[in-house]
């Protein structure tokens, strides 16, 4: 049986949606987030929770959780459309911006968590150095760990600057957006 043009189009869209869902794992996001991102993206206009629930087969409660996760990651937003009473959700149509949003959201969390851990460990180890009766071996190990923590902090500072490099879009001065795919031909 010969496929209709509509069948081929729907098949291609489904492949793209599935690939977007798979790619979300790279960013530490669940595939359900990627699936919803792909569905809204392919729809090319904002969608309601009911529409998304129907398109994914998920409950409205689960869909609400997924959309909230997407909003937290800055890859979706609630939008207003005159005459529509239900909440509408839309996604960034620019793949580059979606990448930057996901990259920044995930790495900002990592940086924040590790800076908190740095402060805690640095305080504990510095307090330990002030104690009497610390063996020379223990003191040496504490100093090694404190030096390691400084290197760690430098790394997370660099990572913070890298995030800013992407968020400011300065990255495009060095790695421009392309109009033609040179590497996929």
From Swiss-Prot:
User: Which Pfam family, any one of them, does this sequence belong to?
Assistant: MarR_2
Means of activity regulation: Is not choline-responsive.
Could you state a single Gene Ontology molecular function term?
DNA binding
Q: Which UniProt keywords apply?
A: DNA-binding, Repressor, Transcription, Transcription regulation
DNA-binding region boundaries:
49-73
Q: Does the keyword Transcription apply?
A: yes
User: Which domain of life does the protein's organism represent?
Assistant: Bacteria
Homology family: Belongs to the GbsR family.
Q: Which PANTHER family match?
A: HTH-TYPE TRANSCRIPTIONAL REGULATOR MJ1563-RELATED
Name recorded for this polypeptide? HTH-type transcriptional repressor OpcR
